[in-house]
């Protein structure tokens, strides 16, 4: 985080993290571990006068490569709720991709993904529009 963000001295950082942890890509994890890691990044950024935008974890119904991961939507909901509360309590910004991209199963809408996890071009277009609007308001453009 130091070399990727702090050393570059940005005005704002958008943090979108957590899905790889939820999927088990980095080993076993839980909501507290995931959110503590994200909160640590936010604390480091804030200490370096970088405004922080915490982004919701994108919806995922199932990680096909990790069938042992049970009920990702519940974990994602819990992480997102913690992120939103933390942002509100600490004067940070919260960027809600989730509500614009979720389907009725609490997965990523098919129109936004090739595999149920990663956004496609249309998904990234939606996300960039949401992020741009938030950043413009933060930076007074």
Language-model regions: role of each:
Residues 1-141:
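Alpha-helical cap/lid subdomain in secreted, periplasmic
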């Amino acid at each position: 985080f130091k070399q990727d963000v702090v050393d570059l001295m940005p005005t704002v950082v958008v943090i979108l993290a957590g899905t790889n942890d939820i999927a088990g890509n980095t080993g076993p994890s839980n909501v507290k571990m995931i959110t503590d890691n994200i909160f640590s990044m936010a604390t480091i950024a804030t200490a370096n006068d970088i405004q922080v935008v915490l982004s919701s974890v994108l919806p995922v119904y199932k990680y096909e490569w990790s069938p042992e991961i049970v009920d990702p939507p519940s974990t994602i909901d819990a992480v997102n709720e913690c992120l939103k509360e933390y942002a509100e309590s600490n004067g940070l910004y919260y960027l809600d991709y989730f509500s614009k991209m979720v389907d009725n199963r609490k997965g990523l809408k098919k129109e936004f993904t090739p595999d149920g996890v990663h956004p496609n071009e249309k998904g990234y277009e939606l996300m960039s529009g949401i992020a741009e609007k938030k950043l413009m308001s933060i930076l007074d453009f």
